[in-house]
A protein has these predicted regions:
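Cell wall/extracellular polymer interaction/catalysis modules
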Residues: 1-144, 155-167, 171-178
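Extended catalytic/binding region for NAD+/ADP-ribose chemistry, centered on the ART fold
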Residues: 146-150
Length: 178
């Protein structure tokens, strides 16, 4: 993902076949409403710069054909963004935990964005205030609160391409690639 200095970006997928990297998809993307940063903070509207593995694939729709473990979201699924909760930056099933937070994304409440999505493994140490709930998800037609979004068709294509060792690189601009 390469930003343009604002909240637009280009997402490019490269696949390694027989030792050779090949571009297999390039598409328009949106990032945080306040751009991309190397100093992400909770609620800043910025997408975190860096290279990350990918976590749980999920969505309100059924598995679109990804080989990754798929969670079909229901009314009990939340991603906690309350910095004072022991569940900060974690996916939880409230039927198992109860509500032990003051703020969280109720995943089913975002039917367009989270029709198909995958977690970006950002802040997996759950450092309070460093940012939470960073996903690659379907576009809603506007900038995100810190996630990366692409069209639903591109999101499905990406999910189908994912391998277990897939990484996502997020860069502020082309110059920061080198």
């Amino acid at each position: 993902v390469v930003g343009n200095g604002g909240n637009y970006a280009t997402l490019t997928v490269h696949t390694k076949r027989n030792g050779v990297w090949t571009e297999t998809l390039s598409c328009s993307a949106r990032v945080g409403k306040n751009g991309i940063t190397g100093n992400k903070r909770e609620g800043d509207g910025k997408t975190p710069r860096g290279i990350y593995s990918l976590g749980q694939a999920f969505g309100l729709a059924g598995n679109p054909g990804t080989s990754r473990s798929w969670l079909q979201v229901n009314n009990n699924h939340y991603w906690v963004d309350d910095v004072n909760s022991s569940y900060y930056n974690k996916l939880v099933d409230a039927s198992q935990t109860g509500i032990q937070w003051n703020s969280a994304e109720h995943l089913i409440s975002y039917p367009t964005a989270y029709r198909y999505a995958i977690a970006v493994n950002y802040n997996t140490a759950c450092t309070r205030g460093a940012g939470s709930a960073i996903f690659l998800h379907c576009s809603t037609g506007r900038a995100t609160a810190g996630c990366i979004s692409v069209s639903q068709n591109d999101m499905v294509r990406i999910l189908k391409m994912l391998q277990g060792d897939t990484l996502i690189g997020i860069y502020q601009n082309k110059n920061s690639l080198y």
